[in-house]
Amino acid sequence: MNYCKISFYFLLSISLSLFLISLKFLLKDLVYFIEWEAWVFKSMSIVMTFLFDWMSLMFMSFVLLISSLVIFYSNQYMEEDYNINRFILLVLMFVMSMMMLIISPNLISILLGWDGLGLVSYCLVIYFQNVKSYNAGMLTALSNRIGDVALLLAIAWMLNYGSWNYIFYLEMMSKNTEMMIIGGLVMLAAMTKSAQIPFSSWLPAAMAAPTPVSALVHSSTLVTAGLYLLIRFNILLTDWWMGQFMLLISGLTMFMAGLGANFEFDLKKIIALSTLSQLGLMMSILSMGFYKLAFFHLLTHALFKALLFMCAGSIIHNMKNSQDIRMMGSLSMSMPLTCSCFNVANLALCGMPFLAGFYSKDLILEMVSLSYVNVFSFFLFFFSTGLTVCYSFRLVYYSMTGDFNSSVLHPLNDSGWTMLFSIFFLMIMAVIGGSMLSWLMFLNPSMICLPFDLKMLTLFVCILGGLIGYLLSNVSLFFTNKALYFYNFTYFAGSMWFMPVVSTIGVINYPLKLGLYSYKSFDQGWSEFFGGQMIYNQLKNYSLYLQEFQMNSLKIYLLSYMLWFIVLLMLVVLVN
């Protein structure tokens, strides 16, 4: 047995065990806080602390479940790769870093998991060794460095207090102005890791990694680390300005990602932007105070998003590494099993009734309708929901229907049983996971009382979004691309509001150009004129001038004596 199967059975067994334990913790409301003295030397001790409650155990079980299926899926997807064992070890290191982050109530150990995620994600993004992967890896690493610095500053600031265990200070953080600095730094760290505006550009760039990594990273590990950290610090968001600021940023991120996905043609980038949109949704509902609801959507989203990426990986695998949806078409005839699961995941993403996404998204929108939010935030929530249906319908229309648009030599069929097993397992979870979790997590159902038109607004927005997606995608012979009429808007929306340009060229090229301009203007310009050359010439002229006075000529001395004598004589005459 190779590393894939051993890791699969090991992680799956631990996942099922942790899920059952988390249910016991949830029903009995248990919390275990464990301190392990790792090293003691006289009066000094190094203590590792772990926090086990139903939230950490359930999240760990989902991370391990998806990781085990991703590793099993990789056994066939990466079978032609010479370094598959190295790949599996990197994925296991990634999972270990995530688990360290989940169970840590201490900012120091959180930083270990946080930095582990950043380092291993860089290694995975540059796994396919080419220039595009190197650029994407560097953008990912440098964007996440900002969050690492914020966490380090929070650790340094907590030196003013008694401990790095943040759970001791949560009540104090929301009331004490000095402790709110820690909250602001943690929020900045979460924004970078969960790719909120203005740190969104690294998330689509990270698609340079292998597709199994994308399924793991964008469902339950890297991008959700920041969100999970904020769920732990949720009491901070009860502060007015922090909650309002986070609501605005996450709402704009959700809207920007949904808009950008409608102008994208790369299959993996569309799903990545979909992840970004759902992260914005989770962040925004968390900033309104519904941390349990955000965690619920985090778990359901992990199921259908991992399924989406696995189906996309199977399609790319069969399309000989082509990711352009314009080159696809009629895949439902060639790959019926994969496309069926792909459609289930898409419907769950859109919030189709009784699938996983419905139980969380519908409840989120109902709670938004019940809450005191302004018109702008209300518009962002519902318009972004319509955009989700729009790009999902567009994706299905381009890839599943119509005629096949690629090479006729492509031998298209469903993948082997290894990949299909992981896909089918997640498909079952995407169907039953939402209802199961809602019954387990919310023992007391929420009382929703809304007018009929507000209750039906979600359904209306979804139908309208699907219709717009159909109209955007419906092309025929002699069709004029409407996007060309609004090219500036299309370019702006399709490039994530110019954020990748600002994050790369803006950070590198413009300072370099400013430095070149300064070098030309000052160092080789006025500084050269007023600097070395000018001083040299002036000193030379002064020295020549003084040299004339020191020639020791008797005629000059007599002349100067006579001139001064005449001047003094004239002064005496004038005075008298």
UniProtKB/Swiss-Prot annotation:
Reaction(s) the record says it catalyses: a ubiquinone + NADH + 5 H(+)(in) = a ubiquinol + NAD(+) + 4 H(+)(out)
Gene Ontology annotations of biological process type: ATP synthesis coupled electron transport; electron transport coupled proton transport
Keyword NAD in annotation: yes
Transmembrane segments: 6-26, 46-66, 88-108, 109-129, 149-169, 179-199, 211-231, 240-260, 270-289, 294-316, 339-359, 363-383, 423-443, 459-479, 492-512, 556-576
EC number in record: 7.1.1.2
Membrane protein topology class: Multi-pass membrane protein
Compartment list: Mitochondrion inner membrane
Keyword tags: Electron transport, Membrane, Mitochondrion, Mitochondrion inner membrane, NAD, Respiratory chain, Translocase, Transmembrane, Transmembrane helix, Transport, Ubiquinone
InterPro entries: NADH_DH_su5_C, ND/Mrp_TM, NU5C-like, Proton_antipo_N
Pfam families reported for this sequence: NADH5_C, Proton_antipo_M, Proton_antipo_N
GO molecular function, one term: NADH dehydrogenase (ubiquinone) activity
Gene Ontology CC: one annotated term: mitochondrial inner membrane
Highest rank taxon of the organism: Eukaryota
Job of this protein: Core subunit of the mitochondrial membrane respiratory chain NADH dehydrogenase (Complex I) that is believed to belong to the minimal assembly required for catalysis. Complex I functions in the transfer of electrons from NADH to the respiratory chain. The immediate electron acceptor for the enzyme is believed to be ubiquinone.
Family: Belongs to the complex I subunit 5 family.
Name of the molecule in the record: NADH-ubiquinone oxidoreductase chain 5
